[in-house]
Amino acid sequence: MPVRMMHMPGIYKMLEIVGTSPTSFADATRAAVAEAAKTVRHMDWFDVVKENGRIVDGQVTEFQVTLKIGFKLER
């Protein structure tokens, strides 16, 4: 259990998602969190699990970020 959860009483769940962006890992992270926020409530933190990219004809064309998002379960 990540240390940052210790001060937040309750039960939490982890959701793993992948965000993509043509410009940066940071934009891919923001896009993933923004999309998850449309359907997941009570998100509290994220961990970057992995960063990948795509190369086409010698050029970086896509940044990919795998995130684990922690959110509190409702009662």
Task: Give the location of each predicted region.
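Short, well-ordered alpha-helical segments
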Residues: P9-W45
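Short glycine/proline-enriched loop/turn "hinge" motifs that connect secondary-structure elements
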Residues: H7-M8, Q59
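A cross-kingdom feature marking charged/low-complexity
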Residues: E51-R75
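Short, Lys/Arg-enriched N-terminal segments with co-localized hydrophobic residues
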Residues: M1-H7
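Charge-dense, low-complexity polyampholytic segments
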Residues: R41-I55
